[in-house]
């Protein structure tokens, strides 16, 4: 995450300079979504962040944070007590365990968390509302009515997806898993028809041999709105 943000900063988005990364909204605690969390705690601090990181996430984020800070205790202590000019604030974390509803607000944006369905793990999506935009991020989820209601007529819907065509070729045990945990291209087309976002951005794509063009074609069979298959560092 930090390295992608640094690339974005170098490409012309100064707000994503590493030392300015001060807030994190976590959808759920699967390892593929949190493996970069310690990097986001520590690297911006090493690069000059001088205030705690504010983290918002589901139940369990507090324990995960405490364990990570304990795991890196020796590194933190050496940086604070040795020759490195490290401050005593930027490695700290303010943890906010979220419930459905507004979880953050400042003069620029409000953030609303809504529950999604990703197996038995507590999971959320987030809606970001500014004076002139509303952007909704699904997180990992099977179709849920809460997302449809909250996202209606949003400017951008960023939603996970898997290829329905390639899903049919998966082993039965994996079909059962993915059908319960994720959203197919056909299901997402139905969601998009009801939401009518200004732009639908696909992310967390499960291709299984499909291409970006294949995903777009599958969705385009029953949805005629604007759709792109997102990549890191895309700007819309």
Predicted regions and their residues:
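Binuclear metal-dependent hydrolase catalytic cores
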Residues: 1-136, 214-236
């Amino acid at each position: 995450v930090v390295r992608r943000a640094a690339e974005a900063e170098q490409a012309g988005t100064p707000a994503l300079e590493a030392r300015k990364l001060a807030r994190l909204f976590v959808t759920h605690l699967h390892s593929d979504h949190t493996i970069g969390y310690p990097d986001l705690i520590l690297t911006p601090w090493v690069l000059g962040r001088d205030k705690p990181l504010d983290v918002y996430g589901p139940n369990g984020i507090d324990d995960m944070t405490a364990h990570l800070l304990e795991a890196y205790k020796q590194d933190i202590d050496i940086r604070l007590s040795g020759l490195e000019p490290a401050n005593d604030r930027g490695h700290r974390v303010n943890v906010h365990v979220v419930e459905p509803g507004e979880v953050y607000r400042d003069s620029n944006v409000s953030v609303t968390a809504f529950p999604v369905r990703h197996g038995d793990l507590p999971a959320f999506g987030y809606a970001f509302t500014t004076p002139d935009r509303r952007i909704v991020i699904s997180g990992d989820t099977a179709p849920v009515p809460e997302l449809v209601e909250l996202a209606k007529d949003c400017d951008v819907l960023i939603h996970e997806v898997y290829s329905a065509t390639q899903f049919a070729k998966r082993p039965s045990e994996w079909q059962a898993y993915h059908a319960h945990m994720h959203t197919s291209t056909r299901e997402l087309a139905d969601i998009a028809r009801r939401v009518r976002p200004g732009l639908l951005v696909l992310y967390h794509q499960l291709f299984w041999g499909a291409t970006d063009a294949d995903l777009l074609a599958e969705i385009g069979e029953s949805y005629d709105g604007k759709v792109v298959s997102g990549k890191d560092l895309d700007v819309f």
